């Protein structure tokens, strides 16, 4: 099992007003999880609270050492919610719960290739 992550950051076209304050940008990570058979699972970690960014960053670095699914699953319960969601989504895709052959993921639209991750992340 191999976990990769890539940081993203972009300004919102319009500020987003929430009960916790105003968001002018989104920051987070794209997760790419690959099993030993080459199957992929994708997730996104984008905490709304700024203080959660540092926690997610530290936890993601620790998860780089995880070499088994069991280690990743054990990390879910102690992780910040945004990280647990992103990792859970990647694991669910590996399990065929989303993006199954009966209902495959569509190809990324051309503008998505302009994201900082580019072809290297999607290949």
Predicted region positions:
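N-terminal capping/lid subdomain adjacent to the active-site entrance of alpha/beta enzymes
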Residues: 1-123
């Amino acid at each position: 099992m191999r976990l990769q992550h890539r940081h993203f950051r972009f300004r919102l076209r319009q500020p987003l007003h929430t009960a916790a304050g105003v968001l002018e940008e989104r920051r987070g990570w794209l997760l790419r999880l690959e099993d030993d058979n080459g199957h992929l699972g994708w997730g996104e970690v984008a905490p709304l609270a700024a203080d959660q960014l540092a926690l997610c960053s530290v936890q993601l670095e620790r998860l780089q050492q995880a070499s088994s699914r069991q280690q990743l699953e054990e990390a879910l319960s102690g992780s910040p919610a945004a990280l647990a969601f992103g990792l859970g989504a990647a694991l669910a895709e590996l399990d065929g719960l989303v993006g199954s052959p009966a209902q495959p993921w569509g190809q990324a639209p051309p503008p998505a290739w302009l994201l900082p991750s580019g072809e290297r992340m999607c290949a």
